[in-house]
Regions:
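AMP-dependent adenylate-forming
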Residues: 7-29
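Conserved pre-ATP/AMP-binding loop-to-beta segment of ANL
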Residues: 16-17, 129, 134, 149-169, ...
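ANL superfamily adenylate-forming
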Residues: 25, 109-161, 268-273
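Conserved AMP-binding/adenylate-forming
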Residues: 26, 41-86, 424
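Conserved AMP-binding A3 loop
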Residues: 29-32, 165-189, 329
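AMP-binding/adenylate-forming catalytic core of the ANL superfamily
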Residues: 84, 90-94, 104-106, 249, ...
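Conserved AMP-binding/adenylation subdomain of ANL enzymes
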Residues: 188-205, 215-255, 264-278
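Gly/Ser/Thr-rich phosphate-binding loop
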Residues: 245, 250-258, 264-335, 347
Length: 523
C-alpha cells in the first residue's frame, strides 16, 4: 500500500458499512465515504483538475475536508490544506499564488479573505463552498455541483508513492511561509509505522478535535483511522470542550490526541471532584492511549493528568517536515519527560553546530532521516538544501538529547533558545518552573535586548481566574527559584497569550510586539 488512494480503497473494502466518521448527527460509512470521494474526484476532473495540479482546502474539520483531500489525490493532484485562521487576503494570496492553486474547497465564513486573494491569483478558477448560504458567482460555486457520476472504477491509480500528495505551509518566524512537500510514501509509511507502536485494534474509536489542516491531526487521527477502519468522532473545533467530552463517553473513544494546552486545561478542570469524576468515569472511561504533540508537555501537566485520570500521556515528537511523527513510545513504555524512541523506518541523531554527531547524553540539534522526511520545500531549492546536513539528514531546529535506550528528550526550539552572557537558556525549562506558581495559568518567555544590547529574559504570564499577583511579587518568585542567568528581568501580565489553531503560543508575535514597543519608546 504505497499511495493514499490505495489506503482509501482498502479501508472501504475492509470497513464496508461500518461507520467511518461521526460528525454531529451525521454518520458516514467507509463505503459511502469512498463513493462521495469518487464523485467529487470526477467533478474535479470535469472542472479541469489533472495530475500534478494543486487544489487548496480552507475548511474547518468536517467530512467534506476528508472528502476533498482524497478526491484531489484521486486525480494525482496535490492537496494544499491551509490554516483557516489565516484570513487576511494578502497572506492567502501568497500561499495560493505560490502553489498555483486551481481551486479551493472552503466554507462561507472564509469567503471574504479568499475573494480578496483571488484577484492576485490568476490560476484560481473556483471556490467550492460546502455549506449553505453563500452567494454564488462565477468564482464562488456550490460544492454540490461537483457531485458527478462516480470516478470510473477501472481507472488506474494515477499516483505513485514518490508523487507529492500534499503541500503544507509552515508559519516561519520570519519571511513568508514555506510549502512542505509530503509524498504519498511519506504519509502512508508514517501512518503505518506509528500504528505499529500504538497497539490499536479495529474496535478502537478515535476523536478528532485538532484541526485537520495540521499534520498531527491528519496523519495521527484521520489516516490512522482509515488505515485500521476505526470509527472517528469528528468535531469542528477544540472549543467548546463540553460537547466532545460528552461524546467521548457516549461513543467509547479509546484514542485521545491533543496538544499540551488541552491537557493543561483538563488538569485544571479536574481539580473539582465533580468534574474529575465526569472526566475519569465518563469521558475518559475507555481511553487507553492519550497522545500529546505539537509542543512540549510539562511534567507538571503530565503528572497532574495521570493523578486525576489514571492515564499516562504518551508524548510524541516530530514536525511537518517529518509527516509528522518521528518518535513516540509504546503505551506500556512511556517515560516522563521523554518523547519516545524513533518509529520504524526513522533514524535520529544529535549534532553540534558543525553538524558533527554527538555522543549519547549530549545536547545538540536533532537530525532525522528515513521514510517520513519531506521531499523538500515547494519552489524553494535553496531552502531545501539548507534544511539538510551534508550527509542528507533533516535538520529539525529542535534541541534534544538521546539516552542509552534511544529515547529522545526535547529541550527546546533552537530558534527560541536565549543566550544570556554566553550561557544557553531553554525557555521550556524556565516556563516549566513558572508553571509551578499557583497564581499562574500559563506563561511564555522570550529574549529581548537590554540597554547595552545584551540579551535578557522577559516573561509574559496569564493569571488564573481570581488569582492576584503583581510584577514585583512575580520577579521575587523568579529570584528565589531560578539561577541568575535564567531569571526573567521583566514580566508582563496579559489577559491571554497569542496562539495558533493548535493553541500553541506564538512567540514571534510577542517578539514583534516587544520590538514595536521599543521602537516607539526610542522615538
Amino acid at each position: 500500500m504505497s499511495t493514499l488512494n490505495a489506503l482509501l480503497d482498502r479501508s472501504a473494502q475492509e470497513g464496508g458499512g461500518k461507520t467511518a466518521i461521526v460528525f454531529g448527527d451525521r454518520e458516514t460509512s467507509f463505503l459511502a465515504l469512498r463513493q462521495e470521494i469518487l464523485e467529487i474526484a470526477e467533478g474535479l476532473r470535469r472542472a479541469g483538475v489533472a495530475k500534478g495540479d494543486r487544489v487548496a482546502i480552507v475548511h474547518r474539520n468536517a467530512p467534506e475536508f476528508i472528502i476533498a483531500y482524497f478526491a484531489i489525490n484521486r486525480l494525482g493532484a496535490i492537496a494544499v490544506p491551509i490554516n483557516f485562521m489565516v484570513q487576511k487576503a494578502d497572506e492567502l494570496a501568497y500561499m495560493l499564488g505560490d502553489c498555483g492553486a486551481k481551486g479551493v474547497f472552503t466554507q462561507k465564513d472564509f469567503l471574504p479573505g479568499l475573494n480578496g486573494a483571488a484577484a492576485k491569483c490568476p490560476d484560481l478558477r473556483a471556490l467550492w463552498v460546502t455549506d449553505a448560504g453563500a452567494e454564488h458567482t462565477a468564482l464562488v460555486r456550490p460544492y454540490s455541483e461537483l457531485r458527478a457520476a462516480a470516478f470510473p472504477e477501472s481507472s488506474a491509480d494515477p499516483a505513485v508513492e514518490g508523487d507529492v500528495a500534499a503541500i503544507l505551509y509552515t508559519s516561519g518566524t520570519t519571511g513568508f511561509p514555506k510549502g512542505v512537500m509530503l509524498t504519498h510514501r511519506n504519509l502512508v509509511t508514517n501512518c503505518e509505522s506509528a500504528l505499529k507502536r500504538m497497539n490499536l485494534t479495529r474496535s478502537d474509536v478515535t476523536l478528532c478535535i485538532l484541526p485537520m489542516f495540521h499534520s498531527f491531526a491528519w496523519t495521527g487521527i484521520v489516516l490512522t483511522s482509515l488505515r485500521l477502519t476505526l470509527t472517528s468522532v469528528v468535531f469542528s473545533a477544540i472549543a467548546p470542550a463540553k460537547p466532545w467530552l460528552k461524546a467521548m463517553g457516549r461513543r467509547g473513544v479509546s484514542l485521545f490526541a491533543a496538544v499540551p494546552q488541552v491537557y493543561a486545561a483538563l488538569v485544571r478542570e479536574a481539580k473539582g471532584w465533580k468534574t474529575r469524576a465526569f472526566l475519569r468515569f465518563w469521558a475518559f472511561r475507555r481511553v487507553k492511549i492519550a497522545v500529546s504533540g505539537a509542543a512540549p508537555l510539562s511534567n507538571v501537566v503530565a503528572d497532574g493528568f495521570q493523578q486525576a485520570l489514571g492515564l499516562a500521556i504518551d508524548q510524541g515528537w516530530g514536525l511537518t517536515e517529518t509527516s509528522p511523527v518521528a518518535t513516540i513510545s509504546a503505551p506500556d513504555a512511556i517515560r516522563l519527560g521523554m518523547v519516545g524512541p524513533p518509529i520504524e523506518g526513522v533514524r535520529v541523531k544529535i549534532v553540534d553546530d558543525l553538524e558533527a554527531s554527538l555522543p549519547i547524553g549530549s545536547e545538540g540539534e536533532i537530525c532525522v532521516s528515513g521514510d517520513c522526511v519531506m521531499k523538500g520545500y515547494w519552489n524553494r531549492p535553496e531552502d531545501t538544501r539548507a534544511a539538510f546536513t551534508a550527509d542528507g539528514w533533516l535538520k529539525t531546529g529542535d534541541i534534544g538529547v538521546l539516552d542509552e535506550d534511544g529515547y529522545l528528550a526535547i529541550r527546546d526550539r533552537k530558534k527560541d533558545m536565549i543566550i544570556v552572557k554566553g550561557l544557553k537558556v531553554f525557555p521550556a525549562q524556565v516556563e516549566a518552573m513558572i508553571a509551578e506558581n499557583p497564581a499562574i495559568e500559563e506563561s511564555a518567555i522570550i529574549g529581548v535586548p537590554d540597554e547595552l544590547g545584551d540579551e535578557v529574559i522577559k516573561a509574559f504570564v496569564v493569571l488564573k481566574k481570581g488569582a492576584v499577583a503583581d510584577k514585583s511579587a512575580l520577579l521575587q518568585y523568579f529570584k528565589e527559584r531560578l539561577d541568575a542567568y535564567k531569571r526573567p528581568r521583566d514580566v508582563e501580565i496579559l489577559d491571554a497569550l497569542p496562539k495558533n489553531a493548535l493553541q500553541k503560543v506564538l512567540k514571534r508575535e510577542l517578539r514583534d510586539r516587544e520590538l514595536k514597543k521599543r521602537d516607539v519608546a526610542g522615538n
